[in-house]
Swiss-Prot record:
Organism of derivation: Pyrococcus abyssi (strain GE5 / Orsay)
Annotated positions binding Mn(2+) 1: 274, 286
Protein name as annotated: Phosphoribosylamine--glycine ligase
Family, similarity comment: Belongs to the GARS family.
ATP-grasp domain mapped to chain residues: 108-316
Length: 438
């Protein structure tokens, strides 16, 4: 089967590997040639992923049978609508269904309309004075969000990126002046986790839970990034999540898919719920209309079933299930020094792939070109898969020793200490639970 993959980051390298394992003849379109994808694809087109017409031209030229969309920006640009008009079934939501991610105010209003469990108190403002008065009256810490896509970097939280509600009002005023509107939400305290599912518009197939490390530096400090790494456990749940929490989070995603169908926007593709586990249970922080990056790398590294068959099930409305190995995974991203604010670009990195393989680790390429030159975003990810989290983390660390160049990474991703910190956070918030082993 000829499959078009749109996107050239680490997430897409992981998707491409899984499609190739499933027997796909792979064709890729992305804005730069990912060296990992270049090796496994039959042909490679260079284009902005949001240039819908150009992507469609490549798809027609290659006569593809199926398309799989990696990143969010082309979804917002209507790439699924355009490919399906050409008769090419596509894994990914339409422009209208992708609003769950691309329009945060629409997503919150959708949750409210449909009584989706796990939702937060929110308000959308286009008037500066009204916004300030509401924040003053509310009185508790808030979260300030731009309405559109920000790559995870535009959200600011009081007590973290913002000192207090006064600073929140200043940032919200800036966003109203820039974008015309702003989303204000209650702050929810707890620990974040990622729950990804496959959906054909009706059926919802859960994947293992993953936890991401969004901050740039060790100890969860520094600017928010696209994600510096992530881990998953062999039991497919996380140490601080109870079976009841898992069921509640899954119900939120199932109710979301059901309500999307009811509203006339059947959701076909991957839905990613970014949850905050609060003392009362899981609360949805935001939806993403595609795989997470890095979280895709964790789950696809242990997918036992054929991704091509799952993709066919999604587009034909008959996805039945997905089996995953009972293994732990650790993904550590290496990023250019200075990332995310002022990254080094153009410098070369040296990667000893043979030595990495001997360590039992796996490499996933992202923002590097075919000459291993840094392009400015996260460069590559090192993946460890093992029976225990401790072993998986050691494998990823061992692989990193064979990469040279002006890059940095978070040594604490997937470590026992960092996970114990998250368990402590939940206990300090008053949540009663017995931690799962990982």
């Amino acid at each position: 089967m000829r499959v078009l993959l749109v996107g050239g980051g680490g997430r897409e390298h992981a998707i491409g590997e899984a499609l190739a394992r499933g027997g796909a003849e792979l064709y890729v379109v992305s804005k730069h040639k990912n060296p990992g994808l270049a090796r496994i694809s039959r042909d490679y087109g260079i284009s902005k992923e949001t240039d819908v017409e150009k992507v469609v031209r490549f798809a027609r030229m290659w006569n593809v049978d199926l398309a799989f969309i990696g990143p969010e920006a082309p979804l917002e640009a209507g790439i699924v609508n355009a490919l399906e008009r050409e008769g090419i079934p596509t894994v990914g939501p339409t422009k209208e269904a992708a609003r769950l991610e691309t329009n945060k105010a629409w997503a919150r209003e959708f949750m409210e309309r449909n009584d989706i469990p796990g939702r937060k108190l929110f308000k959308v403002f286009d008037d500066v004075e009204e916004m300030k008065a509401w924040i003053d009256e509310y009185g508790k810490p808030v979260v300030v969000k731009p309405l559109g896509l920000t790559g995870g970097k535009g959200v600011k939280v009081v007590g973290y990126q913002l000192k207090d509600n006064e600073e929140a009002k200043e940032y919200a005023e800036y966003l109203i002046k820039k974008d015309g509107k702003v989303l204000i939400e209650e702050r929810t305290d707890g620990v974040e986790f990622t729950f990804q599912v496959f959906s054909d518009g009706r059926n919802v197939i859960p994947m293992p839970l993953v936890q991401d490390y969004p901050h740039a530096y060790e100890g969860d400090v520094g600017p928010i990034t696209g994600g510096m790494g992530s881990y998953s456990c062999s039991n497919h749940i996380l140490p601080f999540i109870t079976k009841e929490d898992w069921k509640m989070a899954l119900r939120t995603l199932e109710e979301t898919i059901k309500a999307m169908r009811k509203e006339g926007y059947p959701y076909k593709g991957i839905l990613y719920g970014q949850f905050m586990l609060s003392r009362e249970g899981p609360v949805i922080i935001e939806y993403n209309a595609r795989f997470g990056d890095p979280e895709a790398i964790n789950v696809l590294s242990i997918l036992e079933d054929n991704l091509v068959e799952i993709a066919e099930g999604i587009v034909k409305g008959r996805v039945r299930g997905a089996k995953f190995q009972e293994k732990a995974t650790v993904v550590k991203y290496l990023a250019p020094k200075g990332y995310p604010e002022n990254p080094i670009r153009g410098a070369e990195i040296m990667v000893n792939e043979e030595a990495i393989k001997e360590e039992g680790a796996k490499i996933v390429y992202a923002s590097v070109d075919e000459n291993m030159k840094l392009l400015g975003s996260r460069a590559l990810a090192m993946v460890g898969v093992a029976d225990t989290l401790e072993e998986a983390e050691k494998i990823a660390e061992a692989g990193i020793r064979h990469v040279r160049g002006p890059v940095f990474y978070r040594k604490d991703v997937g470590t026992k200490e960092s996970i114990e910190k998250r368990i402590r956070t939940m206990k300090e918030l008053g949540k009663e639970f017995e931690p799962n082993s990982c």
